[in-house]
Amino acid sequence: EFPPAPNPFHYINDYTNTLSTEHKQILENKLIAYSKETSSQIAVVLVPTTGEYEIADYTFALGDKWGIGRKNLNNGVLMLIAKDDRKVFIATGQGLEGVLPDAFLSQVIRSAILPQFKQGQYAQGINDGLNQIIAASKGEFDAAQVEEDVFDKYIPFLMVLAFIAIV
């Protein structure tokens, strides 16, 4: 039903063999750069079908199962393309809902993604959709927030070490 999480993690996961190796790499590089710059994660998954699941339910369940986004920031985005079902859905973590509301994402699907898909241009449709999502969400989080969060976890430990060193 659900594909297993890729190990190592990939941002572009095509279980339909729709995208060329070159297109996958170009899109992967774009999403790696976005994640490094913002700490947010966008994953794209192409599956043949969602089976008996509604596409929204499938997308949210897959996003939870794979753990897309930083857990403490809940800043993941999952673009799911069910190719044989001819459906697209974009799910966001709560941390990005303010800048990526459902109405905006529906507009991205209708205006950027689907017109390209109808012409058989899947890589271009995904790229166009990602460009709009990235532009809208770029300022929401930055990589420094993740570094601060990691540092905050070690402050009590560092305080104990400093105390021991003084004594």
Predicted regions and their residues:
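Folded, non-transmembrane soluble domains that reside on the lumenal/extracytoplasmic side of membranes
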Residues: 1-162
